[in-house]
Amino acid sequence: MENNPYNMRNLPQIMRSARKAAGLSQYQIGKLIGGKDQRYVSDVENGLAKLTPELCIKWFEKCAAYEHIDLVHYLFKLHPTAAAPIDPALNECASNAVINMVHQLEEALQATKHLARWLTDNRPGKTEELPMADIKQIFDLIAANKTLIYSLVRTHGLKMQELADRWTRKALVDQVAMAKQEGRQAVSV
């Protein structure tokens, strides 16, 4: 992206700010990210150490700066759907996040109906532009979901890893999770 408002060069300062906001010393964050010394942490924060996605994610996780993990995904292009992170100020109030989620769900439902109609009308050989406004509206659910989850972590102590583990167990039981490698190979043989 040519006009990216985020710059990788700013990541060390963002890491320093997140550490300070979490009330951690350089010594404390060093221990939390894998037994690193204060000098190493200082080098990271001054842009003298090579930043990896793993280091940045671990750092921001220890600082409970979840939006910053989204920033890492975006800056390092770790996933095609990685987008600009949500402003942390929007993730402070769970009731506002629920209201936003309901609003986004309603709009996404309409957009999904429009998309379904577009797909039904689409015929072989007929070239028509994708309905990007509708697809974007559906994409907005990703941010709305993160806003709700992050706000529940901050205001009600939701444990994200526990939620992810529960979802994974249920998805495996319901057979909607990605099959293990052996299963995929067996199907393709």
From Swiss-Prot:
Q: What is this protein called?
A: Uncharacterized HTH-type transcriptional regulator YqaG
Keyword list (alphabetical) reads: DNA-binding, Transcription, Transcription regulation
| Matches recorded under InterPro entries | Cro/C1-type_HTH, Lambda_DNA-bd_dom_sf
Q: Which Pfam families match?
A: HTH_3 (PF01381)
- Name the SUPFAM superfamilies on file: lambda repressor-like DNA-binding domains
Molecular function as annotated in GO: DNA binding
The HTH cro/C1-type domain, residue ranges: 15-72
Annotated DNA-binding residue span(s): 26-45
